Design a protein with these regions (language model features):
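Nucleotide phosphate-binding/pyrophosphate-handling subdomain across enzymes
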Residues: 3-6, 18-26, 110, 140, ...
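Residue-level detector of alpha-helix initiation sites
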Residues: 14, 80, 120-124, 280, ...
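Phosphate-binding loop of NTP-binding sites
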Residues: 24-25, 63-70, 77-224, 228-238, ...
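Short internal beta-strands
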Residues: 29-37, 220-224, 351-352, 371-379
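C-terminal helical cap/extension that packs against the catalytic core
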Residues: 46, 362-416
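N-terminal leader/targeting and accessory segments in enzymes
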Residues: 1-98, 102
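Short beta-strand "acidic-cap" motif of Rossmann-like dinucleotide-binding folds
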Residues: 30-34, 143, 165, 242, ...
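Beta-strand->loop->alpha-helix junctions that form or flank phosphate-binding loops
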Residues: 59-60, 97-102, 237-255, 301-305, ...
């Protein structure tokens, strides 16, 4: 499969770059098209792909590029599902897949996949699961997926008997055909990220596709507390197992402050360093996954008790003059900001705002009890300020995050928490939200004189 074919890759980025290299190695004729001009692409990637024989088309999507001579269209996850090439490919009966599906079909026999999806908590759960599995089984465990490592990038290092821990996004799920994990995990479903998918039903369907590809020999680990997850997964064929932070169930659950796995105490949540009940749930999901491979409680405790979180996700930055600073730039929706605010019981100052998307900030009100001030930033800052005043909170309005730090010295006191949890995307001012988080962290380091 994928030998001596003519293939169009739509979208460069990490996945397009890695897919192109794999396909060229296998003797395919490869075209890669990206709307961005060449001078805005990664020059090293472009040079390498051109040198190995990839036909590169940048700056537009020419109407005559895609025709019936192509055998496959491989779509980058960020490309809309109604893109003209996608629609034309379907008219011409050209299979439309993604990089994950392609790489999955090229994996050696006997490779297990732990696939983790959901609206929130995917990256944290994937990272914890990988670190536990790697501690237990060493280099036979690999990390891949929507966490910065395309599946095709690890093909040459994976052997039969190895295990891949993958984060899977809804955009990837859109073009799954056969892909499925042996152990699948759903952290939760909510309507936070549906803009790419148009409707919530479509969003859930794409998230669920890999589970509907499973057989009764596979495992689906589900959040028992999330009714949308339970409803969406009610007809899957795989063996369903559950975790719950709210009630004692047959699976992984809490009693007082202890996590149990089918009646066996695994650890106390006081030993989990990352903040919030949502992170307890992420740990529980990871426990369920690794227990399918017989990992001991001792290994789980050793990894989890030393895990300090994923960068940019409620990440502890530092304490300066008794004030704790947290970088939660990945909180690009209301639900994530709710989770952040519920994680602290100290007086809190929150940086809130970013790209205007019509967010309903009123949904934050039940979580605002400990908030002493709001610093409104970004293109939606005036609407954030209006909301803050409506609930009687002090608010300070700045276009840019860095300017908000000038006010902090006047309003923080020892014992406070300052958190960047903007409930907004970053594209109004930043290429990606990680840049916003790095800027926040830099300002904290400057406060400390570093």
């Amino acid at each position: 499969m994928f030998k001596d074919n003519k293939i169009l890759i739509l979208g460069l980025a990490r996945s397009g770059y890695q897919a192109a290299k794999v396909l060229i190695e296998r003797g395919n004729t490869v075209y890669l098209n990206d709307f961005k001009e060449e001078d805005k692409q990664d020059s090293e990637q472009v040079s390498e792909l051109r040198n190995i024989g990839v036909n590169l088309v940048f700056g537009s999507h020419p109407d005559d590029l895609l025709d019936e001579s192509f055998d496959y269209l491989i779509k980058n996850p960020g490309v809309p599902i109604d893109h003209k090439y996608v629609l034309k490919a379907r008219e011409l009966n050209i299979p439309v897949i993604n990089e994950v599906e392609m790489a999955y079909k090229l994996l050696p026999e006997g490779v297990d996949i732990i696939g983790i999806t959901g609206t929130n908590g995917k990256t944290t759960t994937t990272t914890i699961t990988y670190e536990i599995m790697h501690k237990a089984f060493g280099d036979k465990v690999h990390l891949a997926g929507n966490i910065g490592y395309p599946l095709s990038s690890i093909l040459n290092s994976v052997k039969s008997g190895d295990i891949i821990v993958m984060e899977c996004s809804c955009q990837q799920g859109e073009n799954f055909v056969d892909f499925h994990p042996h152990v699948g995990v759903v952290t939760n479903f909510s309507e936070a990220h549906i803009d790419f998918m148009k409707t919530y039903e479509h969003y859930k369907n794409t998230k669920s596709k890999m589970f509907y590809n499973q057989s009764d020999n596979d495992i689906a680990i589900l959040n028992h507390d999330n009714s949308d997850v339970l409803d969406e997964m009610k007809n899957i064929s795989s063996n369903k197992k559950y975790f719950s932070s709210k009630e004692k169930i047959d699976g992984c659950y809490l009693v007082d402050r202890d996590i149990y796995y089918y009646g066996d105490k695994v650890m106390c949540i006081d030993d989990i360093k990352i903040k919030g009940m949502h992170n307890v749930e992420n740990v529980m999901a990871a426990i369920m996954a690794v227990k399918e491979y017989g990992v001991s409680n001792e290994v789980i405790f050793d990894v989890v008790s030393n895990f300090r979180g994923v960068e940019h996700r409620l990440e502890y930055v530092d304490t300066v003059d008794g004030v704790e600073y947290y970088n939660d730039t990945e909180a690009t929706n209301i639900k994530c900001a709710q989770i952040a605010l519920s994680s602290f019981n100290k007086p809190t100052i929150i940086f809130l705002g970013g790209l205007e998307r019509g967010q309903d900030f009123n949904e934050l009100t039940p979580y605002m009890d400990n908030v002493k001030a709001i610093i409104a930033i970004g293109t939606c800052r005036e609407r954030v300020a209006e909301y803050a005043r409506s609930i009687g909170k002090d608010v300070y309005v700045y276009e840019h995050l860095v300017d908000g730090f000038d006010k902090l010295k006047d309003i923080v006191t020892s014992g406070d928490v300052v958190v960047l949890s903007p409930a907004s995307a970053s594209w109004d001012q930043y290429k990606e939200c990680e840049v916003r988080g790095a800027e926040f962290k830099q300002k904290v380091h400057e406060l400390k004189g570093e």
